[in-house]
Amino acid sequence: MQHDKNEDIYRLSTYYYDLPPELIAQYPAEYRDSSRLLVLDRKSGDLNDRAFKDISLYLKKGDALVLNETRVIPARFFAYKESGARVEILLLKKLGDDWEALVKPARRLKAGSRVFLSPDKPLVIEIVEELDFAGGRRVRFQDSVDEDTLLQEQGHIPLPPYINRPDEELDRERYQTVYACKSGSVAAPTAGLHFTPDLLKEITLQGINIVRIVLHVGMGTFRPVKNEDIRQHNMHLEYYEVAEDAAALLNLTRESGGQIVAVGTTVVRTLESVYNKDCGFLAGKGETNKYIFPGYQFRAIDKLLTNFHLPGSSLLMLVAGFAGTESTLAAYRHAVENRYRFFSYGDAMLVI
């Protein structure tokens, strides 16, 4: 069931589905591993409703569970123009001494503008230039600022727009995985949010290898697919790192007959980017704009753990590429009917 033959798989409209708004999780589950887990067998299309803690039943000794250890930076700032008008700045990535940022309302923030981080303090962010994407700006903090301290003290966790509330203190913990350690993302790799230290320890004691890689989630996560022919979509570049020991463990897993289980679409895109059919997994760091949709030949992964994704998103298309479009959409209908919780703070799906 993996490869659907008809042309509908390339139509954007195929990837829209009906989602009652009350199923969009606004807060995380009380306990990380108390989420639900929908298991989809991509060969048969069979579905199984489980608890997330049951994931270890689908892993075996010698498998590799691959985690993205990126950390979300508190990169959202609410600032003020000299007129007192409120604006929003989301830092995306460092550009030398400056930052690439997404600003709104963009029409009010032209090159040369200055904004203040509070109405009564003279802490300045300068808009240096306009960039080549909607709302994109190069911005610069005034010289004397310790940026790390500023991020921690005044930055907000950049919750996705479908979470209809301000960020709270709990988000500083719960919108990070328990293994997040390398700062650089503007959105969490959400499939990993369900793991606890105890569950990871239990999985390790089963003889499963835990492999850690990095992909910093960036602009691409906010970029909707707009082309009706999804093959025309382009992804933004995102930074990744695969260390020598991680590549070696992945290659050893394959050579030993183990399966590679990707925790999240970010891991899939990274592993598919560094896999070479002649040499296996290659260590390295760089940027990838790997775009995966139905018809793609997967080479690097055997199973995929992921959350439920937005209608019409490139992430949903990646899942459909792995599981088959019809099976994926049927799983989503099942999830809606059975009141699963959707998106970043929602439940998980395991494709086997």
From Swiss-Prot:
**Pathway assignment:** tRNA modification; tRNA-queuosine biosynthesis
The EC number(s) attached to this protein equal 2.4.99.17
Give the molecular function GO annotations. S-adenosylmethionine:tRNA ribosyltransferase-isomerase activity
Which InterPro entries did the record assign? QueA, QueA_dom1, QueA_dom2, QueA_sf
TM segments?
Answer: none
- Is Glycosyltransferase there in the keyword field? no
Keywords assigned? Cytoplasm, Queuosine biosynthesis, S-adenosyl-L-methionine, Transferase
In the record, biological process GO terms are: queuosine biosynthetic process; tRNA wobble guanine modification
Name the GO cellular-component terms.
Answer: cytoplasm
Q: Where in the cell is it found?
A: Cytoplasm
Q: What reaction gets catalysed by this protein?
A: 7-aminomethyl-7-carbaguanosine(34) in tRNA + S-adenosyl-L-methionine = epoxyqueuosine(34) in tRNA + adenine + L-methionine + 2 H(+)
Coiled-coil residues are: none
Q: What does this protein do?
A: Transfers and isomerizes the ribose moiety from AdoMet to the 7-aminomethyl group of 7-deazaguanine (preQ1-tRNA) to give epoxyqueuosine (oQ-tRNA).
**Oligomer and partners:** Monomer.
**Database matches in PANTHER family:** S-ADENOSYLMETHIONINE:TRNA RIBOSYLTRANSFERASE-ISOMERASE
Stated family: Belongs to the QueA family.
Tell me the protein's name: S-adenosylmethionine:tRNA ribosyltransferase-isomerase
